[in-house]
Amino acid sequence: MSDAGRELRALPVSGLPEIEAGANLGKTIAALAELRDGDLLVIAQKVVSKAEGRVIPLSSAIPGAEARRLAAVLGKEPALVQLILDQSSEVLRAERNVLITETHHGFVCANAGIDTSNLPEDGTVCLLPSDPDASARKLRAEITTAIAEEPGVGLAGHSPSAESHSRLLPTIAVVISDSFGRAWRLGQAEVAIGCAGLTPLDDWRGREDANGQKLEATMIAVADEAAAAADLVRSKDSRVPAVVVRGLDRFVTSDDGPGAGALRRPPQEDLFR
């Protein structure tokens, strides 16, 4: 089916407070977002990590010999290098002050995704969620529960009675996004590191293009493209970690789906390692 004429909207969710460890992030977002059936919520990784207690003191890491060696070569803080190694399954590149690793999740990125920006306390670092797909599933459940328990919460254009409320519960998707660099291009782009309730890949293999030619390899990274679209309406200093993306309801599913793990290329198909 042609996508001609379809509209995509990205709506920032404003007003989120500073999130602390143990917070019910899904409930907090549900109280502020106006959601419709088929909406997709893109949530920044950092706020998820904060809620999950993944912001830790840099001083908690005790550098080993390899961390000290790499730190001397790269000009990085030894404790930070140790944390990067702890969060990685393999070091792929270590040069020019850059440490590229494969994380335990299977992500290939700089510094194992560890970040020091936009943190309320000095001397702390933010780790990626331990299991971003599980985090996305949990957030989706929290948001749905919050809407179910409080009539009117999180529903765009509705003030339902408690009796009719259950019939209005929206089916939504959640994407957890993070900024990744690209090996052959300058700049960073948001990608999906976790998702739930979404078809993350739109497989066009075997279909025909506009000229009737059979497509052999085309797979659209829906979750990544939604993450990137959401990032265009928030800035890194905006304190807006959540964005509603509307218009992708054809990819939103009733079940949690395969998650963003489906986007990772199998090692045996990787031409560059």
Q: Positions of the model-derived regions?
A:
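N-terminal, positively charged regions that mediate nucleic acid binding
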Residues: 3-66
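Hydrophobic/aromatic-rich, well-ordered segments within soluble, folded domains that form packed cores
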Residues: 34-56, 139-147, 170-189
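Intrinsically disordered, low-complexity terminal tails and inter-domain linkers enriched
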Residues: 3-5, 145-171
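A structural signal for small-residue-enriched, beta-sheet-centric alpha/beta enzyme cores
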Residues: 5, 9-16, 55-62, 66-123, ...
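Phosphate-interacting basic helix/loop segments used at nucleotide- and nucleic-acid interfaces
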Residues: 20-33, 130-150
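Catalytic cores of large soluble enzymes that bind and process phosphate-bearing ligands
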Residues: 17-21, 25, 39, 124-131, ...
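Intrinsically disordered, low-complexity linker/loop segments enriched in Gly/Pro
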Residues: 107-142, 146
